[in-house]
């Protein structure tokens, strides 16, 4: 809403070189210019909007303000201006007036509200009768107006309740009867009337315009010191915007040579992150460039990235990067890849899926010192296998025994030259010499 009001006010100030801005009406006294805005906004927003419209010509060096009423004639003139926009020539909307009860002695243009001012507050439970004044709805000039109202309120001008008269439908107000005022909360939504001091004609090229306007600050833009849409434009930052040093919220962030969002230099959260030579997300030099990555010191998607190629089989050792990974110092899925360990793998010191791959062990495998699925692979044992010291699925595979096999110390393989082979008739161990066991059984029988 503020952006819309800023654009409208800038166009008004730029549009004409006459003694009143475009679409403003000069008062009968010739001292002021008025314009009715049928936009419902809170009091403070209406006040800021009117301040952005500066006087035309070289008249009084004052900014615009919400309308200030200093006489019955001015009160009626503003009322008729607003009423002229309705079908029945009656005032339809309540409008803000430029007097805030938090500073009750002055109108917003700087003139005193009283004791020499004018007021037309109605007599109602919301605004009790003024001392010394009868409870009427007349519009007196009040040389000693003590009305200040509760804090956080401002006056609105509205038409008085029309009397019910036959033949007039109960809608007409007698000619010459002006509006009434009522103090309402400044957070309420009302239309408003702006007042600008009238000036003398000057060339259009000298008119104040968008180059010196702003919304809340004295230089153009929206909230920043030099914000806007030029060489140093932006929104909210010191020099942010969409230009040479554009950005949004950072010191020099943006989409240019050093672009970024929120970081000291371009990127997202890191010291040099971004999408450039050293871009990244969250790491010291992470990103998607020469040393890009996600979270690690050198991980990423570049010369040292760590991301498995989905087009390759999982057991191949060729990966996208030499030392890529996610989260570790040199983790990844390449020559020494891994996830979370000091060197590649998952949880172990040198675990992974390569020459010495593993999961969780000191060297590749699953739980053991040298477990894995290669020459000495295994799961859980010190050497490859599942549970035994040298179990696995290779030359010495086994499950659960000290040496490969299924439960025993030696595998059931008659071609195994190992002297502990239970099928070897020369086995000196009677417990595992099957021919000898059969002979002993026959002898006992």
Curated annotation (Swiss-Prot):
Ranges of Pro residues composition bias in the record: 414-428
All copies of domain C-type lectin, residue ranges: 29-159
Tissue: Expressed specifically in the micromere/primary mesenchyme cells (PMC) lineage.
InterPro entries xref list: C-type_lectin-like, C-type_lectin-like/link_sf, CTDL_fold, Pericardin-like_rpt, SM50_spicule_matrix
Pfam short name (any one): Pericardin_rpt
Biased composition (Polar residues): 309-321
First and last residue of the signal peptide: 1-15
Entry-linked Gene3D superfamilies: Mannose-Binding Protein A, subunit A
Keywords: Repeat, Signal
UniProt region (Disordered), positions on chain: 118-178, 210-445
The keyword Signal appears for this protein: yes
Listed Gly residues bias regions: 210-299, 324-408
Function: Major matrix protein of the sea urchin embryo spicule. The function of the matrix proteins is to direct crystal growth in certain orientations and inhibit growth in others.
Note on domains (UniProt): The repetitive domain may provide a calcite binding matrix.
Family membership noted in the UniProt record: Belongs to the SM50 family.
Stated name of the protein: 50 kDa spicule matrix protein
């Amino acid at each position: 809403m503020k952006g819309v009001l800023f654009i409208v006010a800038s166009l008004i100030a730029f549009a004409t070189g006459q003694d009143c801005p475009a679409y403003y009406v000069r008062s009968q006294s010739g001292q002021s210019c008025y314009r009715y805005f049928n936009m419902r906004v809170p009091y403070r927003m209406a006040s800021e909007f009117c301040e952005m419209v500066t006087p035309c010509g070289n008249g009084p060096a004052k900014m615009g303000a919400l309308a200030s009423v200093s006489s019955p004639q001015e009160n009626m003139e503003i009322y008729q201006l607003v009423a002229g926009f309705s079908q029945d020539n009656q005032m339809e909307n309540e409008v803000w007036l430029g007097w805030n009860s938090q500073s009750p002695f002055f109108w917003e243009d700087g003139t005193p509200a009283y004791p020499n001012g004018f007021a037309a507050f109605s007599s109602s439970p919301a605004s009790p009768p003024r001392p010394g004044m009868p409870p009427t709805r007349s519009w007196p000039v009040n040389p000693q107006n003590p009305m200040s109202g509760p804090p956080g309120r401002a006056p609105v001008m509205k038409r008085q309740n029309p009397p019910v008269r036959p033949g007039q439908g109960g809608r007409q107000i007698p000619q010459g009867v002006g509006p009434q005022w009522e103090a309402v909360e400044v957070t309420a939504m009302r239309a408003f009337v702006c007042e600008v001091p009238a000036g003398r004609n000057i060339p259009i090229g000298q008119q104040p315009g968008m180059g010196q306007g702003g919304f809340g600050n004295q230089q153009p833009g929206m909230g920043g010191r030099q914000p806007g849409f030029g060489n140093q434009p932006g929104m909210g930052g010191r020099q942010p915007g969409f230009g040479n040093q554009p950005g949004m919220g950072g010191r020099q962030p943006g989409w240019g040579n050093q672009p970024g969002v929120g970081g000291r230099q371009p990127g997202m959260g890191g010291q040099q992150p971004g999408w450039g030579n050293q871009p990244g997300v969250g790491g010291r030099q992470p990103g998607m460039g020469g040393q890009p990555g996600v979270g690690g010191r050198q991980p990423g998607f570049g010369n040292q990235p760590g991301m498995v190629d989905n087009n390759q089989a999982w057991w191949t050792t060729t990966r996208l990067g030499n030392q890529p990974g996610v989260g570790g110092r040199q983790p990844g899925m390449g020559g020494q890849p891994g996830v979370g360990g000091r060197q590649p793998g998952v949880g172990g010191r040198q675990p992974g899926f390569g020459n010495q791959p593993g999961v969780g062990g000191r060297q590749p495998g699953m739980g053991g010192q040298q477990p894995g699925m290669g020459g000495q692979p295994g799961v859980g044992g010190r050497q490859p296998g599942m549970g035994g010291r040298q179990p696995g699925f290779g030359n010495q595979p086994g499950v659960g025994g000290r040496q490969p096999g299924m439960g025993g110390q030696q595998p059931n393989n008659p071609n195994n030259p190992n002297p502990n082979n239970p099928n070897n008739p020369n086995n000196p161990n009677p417990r595992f010499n099957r021919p000898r066991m059969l002979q002993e059984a026959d002898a006992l029988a």
